[in-house]
């Protein structure tokens, strides 16, 4: 599982 800045944009 990876969390990126783009994922957090939601």
Curated annotation (Swiss-Prot):
Top-rank taxon, per record: Eukaryota
What is the name attached to this protein's record? Unknown protein 2
Q: Which organism is it from?
A: Pseudotsuga menziesii
Its lineage opens with: Eukaryota, Viridiplantae, Streptophyta, Embryophyta, Tracheophyta
């Amino acid at each position: 599982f990876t969390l990126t800045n783009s994922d957090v944009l939601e």
